[in-house]
Amino acid sequence: TRRTAFLFDELSLWHSASQYALILPVGG
């Protein structure tokens, strides 16, 4: 259970990071 929660947290973090990576170049 804890491992799955950690994986989900990492996934959400990766998703937000990818969104920022897509938004930053366009905004800049």
From Swiss-Prot:
One of its GO terms (molecular function) is arylalkyl acylamidase activity. It comes from the Bacteria. Disulfide bonds: none annotated. Its EC number is 3.5.1.76. Activated by divalent metal ions. Inhibited by certain thiol reagents. It catalyses: an N-acetylarylalkylamine + H2O = an aralkylamine + acetate. Keywords: Hydrolase. Homotetramer. Shows a strict specificity for N-acetyl arylalkylamines but not acetanilide derivatives. This is Arylalkyl acylamidase. It comes from Pseudomonas putida (Arthrobacter siderocapsulatus).
